[in-house]
Regions:
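Short FAD-binding loop at a beta-strand-to-alpha-helix junction that anchors the flavin cofactor
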Residues: 68
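Amphipathic alpha-helical coiled-coil "transmission" helices that mediate dimerization
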Residues: 7-61, 65
Length: 275
């Protein structure tokens, strides 16, 4: 009788069950190793992402500071009160809150509003510092500062600068369509522009300029009421008037800070943080 040929399995000294167990253990080890390597890779990616986020945050901070500084320089060239832009930001934030806007948007608006006149950096000093009436041509050039401001900051993908560009372009629009540079009217004017229009008007007329003295606060409040529905959005005016006492207190506080800071520190620090 011829002996039956043995298969490789018959020649393997390791019992089938034990062999299967070893294969499973090896597979589990390889899986564990792969999992560890994947976790390490994820950890490295997380570190890289954190470093990237920090770098982006730093760049955005420097970018914001550069634009704030540019707004300050435009303000100084125009002969504005040293904290004009900071006050505009503070008033705008208060008005937005009175309108029921979110705290996040109010904070964003407060920062963005401070760059409303950044476009004046592109207007010649002879026009900005002129004490007499502007000629027709000078006035035409002056009315370009909203477009200039929007061109400077409006192309950014950062929310603060996007809103600042929107404000720069629209804060001289009138509710009745008689403003500039686009001739927008009503709700076609972005809310931020409608808010800053009131804040800017109030602050500009309650502080001295090279060509006129400041008007009494209550006189300016009456002027804003008279322009309700014409130059200014009725709802924004109503919101402003509902917090008029708070606006007055904020103005007085910032005027005092301006006086103290100007006497002791100068204007080279974080001036926009005094609000």
């Amino acid at each position: 009788m011829t002996p039956q040929a043995k298969t490789p399995l018959d020649l393997d000294p390791i019992p089938p069950f034990e062999r299967l167990t070893r294969l499973l253990e090896e597979a589990e080890h390889e899986t564990s190793t792969a999992r560890t390597q994947l976790e390490q890779a994820h950890g490295q990616m997380a570190v890289i992402q954190r470093e990237r986020d920090r770098a982006v945050s730093t760049i955005r901070k420097l970018n914001r500071e550069a634009f704030f500084d540019l707004a300050r320089r435009a303000e100084q060239r125009d002969g504005e009160s040293p904290l004009h832009t900071a006050r505009i930001g503070a008033y705008s934030g208060l008005i937005a809150a009175s309108l029921g806007s979110t705290a996040t948007w109010c904070e964003l608006l407060e920062g963005a509003a401070q760059m409303h006149d950044i476009g004046k950096i592109g207007i010649h000093d002879s026009i900005l510092s002129k004490t007499g009436p502007l000629t027709t041509e000078e006035w035409r050039l002056m009315r370009e500062h909203p477009r200039i401001g929007a061109a400077i900051i409006g192309q950014s993908d950062e929310p603060l600068l996007q809103l600042a560009g929107e404000i720069a372009m629209t804060h001289h629009e009138h509710y009745n369509g008689a403003g500039y540079p686009l001739g927008l009217c009503g709700r076609d004017i972005p809310l931020a522009g409608r808010i800053v229009a009131v804040a800017d008007f109030f602050d500009a007329l309650t502080h001295d300029r090279s060509y006129r003295k400041a008007l009494p606060v209550d006189t300016v409040l009456s002027m804003i009421r008279e322009r309700r529905g014409e130059q200014f959005d009725p709802q924004v005016v109503d919101a402003f008037m509902s917090i008029a006492e708070q606006i007055k207190q904020t103005r007085q506080r910032m005027v005092e800070k301006e006086r103290i800071y100007q006497a002791t520190e100068g204007w080279d620090g974080d001036w926009w943080m005094l609000a």
